[in-house]
Amino acid sequence: MAIKVFQHFLCICLFSLAIPLPSHASQSKPKAENTTSFDFIKHLEGGRKGQKVKGLQQLKTYLQEFGYINYSPNKTRANDDDFDDSLEAAVKTYQFNYHLKTTGTLDAQTVSQMTAPRCGVPDISNGTNWMQVGKNVPSHTQNAIHTVSHFSFFKGNPKWPSTRDRLTYAFAPGTSSDAISAVAKAFNTWASQTQFRFSQSQNFVSADFKIGFYIGDHGDGAPFAGPNGALAHSFAPPDGRLHYNGDQSFSVNPIAGSFHLETVALHEIGHLLGLQHSSVQDAIMWPSIPAATIKGLHAEDIQGFNNSPDVEPIRFSSYVFQCNV
């Protein structure tokens, strides 16, 4: 889909303690029935159509959260543990998006990808598989794509108008200085490749982008599920909210067991600017990222931005880097 221009910076990986990041959520506890931790999927390996396996109902919830399946309200199939036709089609679409063999079964590779840390924004929304826009989609995935849920994210595919090229961002009270610095660097990186200019504001209420760390059910309709769920999520223009999962471990430097603050910010800012997920694994808009990994902008990310309506083409000139500990 994109021209793969991939250059490597020399990454100097400095080891340090993970940052203790405060949570700025309400005091409400996480609601188990509304959250999806990914570890349960490990116990479903080997599942296939026709089987009844305890936990498949949770998998249906997982796939519905990320846009792969939708059961109408008058159907009970969403609340059972049957591996039905709709679930098989959803698994095939997921496998296709993540460059896996489209078996429709929960093989080891599929389970490994499904349990990987990822962004909480859906891959498919409003009936569109954003990871495959402009590509020929195999017929076995068509039904799943046409039966996806509609989410509050990216409804109508909104973009910031060309007249709004100077935007402000602010942090929830108590956000650490290290986190603020990392997110600011990510905004600067996007500014270097787009027409946007970003500046930090001290007014959290009036800022265009509002960044904070939250736990559990924090009032935005997309509760976090603890340390084994989504890393972060953000909302499309002009909403501007970017929420890190406060139960995850984040750090300024790539250390084992922690997620790189700036890399996660680069991804989520892409959503704030209107970008969807990419099927190019090297792109910052690829939905998942391992711990202790640094990524930068990729040509695919810039191409995606240039293909957005009301945006003047931007020349891609920065280096792209990736570093794993």
Give residue ranges: language-model regions.
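Zinc-dependent metalloendopeptidases
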Residues: 2-325
